[in-house]
């Protein structure tokens, strides 16, 4: 098919530039996750649990930022997003179980996939979208103990979308949902017993959404390597790399 220079220029003019702040947020979320998982390599570093509390809310905020863009609210774009999450949910489960000793939950991607369906049901009035969102909430309620971050983890991407364009202090409300997603009863009990990481972990959960929103709004001049679809593979890959490191140390 012949494409004129004028058509190419028209398409180029309508392409949105990449958001460097959003890419930076994704890289920082990945770094926080890796720091958290270093606790399972063999080092005595329970304090890494604290920066690890930033990872999930920042991934949820990145999802909300992507879905807030006009071009990703189309049905096709969001189905592709869901497809990638479901594909790597399956691909990542075996590396996840190889690395994490006796996991009580699935890997984090099923939680994000259900969260995507909830957001999609909120954004689109179509009956199918609303039914899928209701089904996602039902599954999250029934299988909350099997989902990483549970029922509130499924809600967190939607909450992030609600506060995305609101004043900064709404991020602190999202922080309450983040605390609930991180087993607040366990953290509260650990804090009462004097666990040195519990109170900083609660604080990290509370401020994580606000920190992420601050970054997206004020780090516009950064230009980190863009995170594209290949980045999904980093999730199962980091389990295998850390597993190899643990075996090498042992």
Task: Give residue ranges: language-model regions.
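Alpha-helical transmembrane segments and their immediate juxtamembrane cytosolic regions
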Residues: 1-250
């Amino acid at each position: 098919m012949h494409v004129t220079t004028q058509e190419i220029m028209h398409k180029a003019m309508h392409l949105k530039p990449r958001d460097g702040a959003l890419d930076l947020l994704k890289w920082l979320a990945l770094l926080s996750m890796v720091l958290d998982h270093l606790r399972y390599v063999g080092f005595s570093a329970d304090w890494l649990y604290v920066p690890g509390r930033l990872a999930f809310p920042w991934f949820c905020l990145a999802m909300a930022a992507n879905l807030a863009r006009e071009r990703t609210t189309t049905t096709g774009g969001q189905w592709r997003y869901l497809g990638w999450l479901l594909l790597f949910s399956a691909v990542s489960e075996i590396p996840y179980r190889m690395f994490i000793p006796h996991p009580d939950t699935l890997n984090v991607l099923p939680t994000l996939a259900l969260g995507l369906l909830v957001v999609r049901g909120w954004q689109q009035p179509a009956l199918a979208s609303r039914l899928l969102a209701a089904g996602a909430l039902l599954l999250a309620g029934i299988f909350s103990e099997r989902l990483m971050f549970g029922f509130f983890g499924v809600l967190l991407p939607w909450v992030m979308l609600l506060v995305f364009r609101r004043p900064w202090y709404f991020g602190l409300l999202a922080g309450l949902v983040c605390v609930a997603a991180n087993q607040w009863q366990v953290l509260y009990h650990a804090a009462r017993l004097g666990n040195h990481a519990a109170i900083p972990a609660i604080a990290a959960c509370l401020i994580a959404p606000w920190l992420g929103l601050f970054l997206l709004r004020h780090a516009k001049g950064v230009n980190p390597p863009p995170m594209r679809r290949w980045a999904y593979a980093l999730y199962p890959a980091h389990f295998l790399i850390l597993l190899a490191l643990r075996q090498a140390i042992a």
